[in-house]
């Protein structure tokens, strides 16, 4: 499998390679200072029929949608970790852990991807599929 799979450490906006069938991000898009820039790079690195699998914390689009035990915990984590991390980077969009589907969809569409859907979810995470 080493001829088909590799792991690299690189900035989300400049990792190497093109023509990827699948790009995955796990619980990180909301922490990025420039998630739109990272999403644009994902789009550029994907094959024409590629897929981007985005795993993000489960969240509703409105504050009142997140007034539950998990949402409250995620707001706490977001205040302590996610938002300051994003603000400390270039652009500093600060989506936070409770960004919600609409905010993630907006990032993806602004990056030039045209198809977006919620593919799966758990009480803690939402899995989105984005395609060119």
Listing of model-derived features with the role each one plays in the protein:
Residues 36-49:
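A short glycine-rich, Lys/Arg-flanked "PGG" loop and its adjoining helix->strand segment in the class I
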Residues 55-111:
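C-terminal alpha-helical "lid/dimerization" subdomain adjacent to the S-adenosyl-L-methionine
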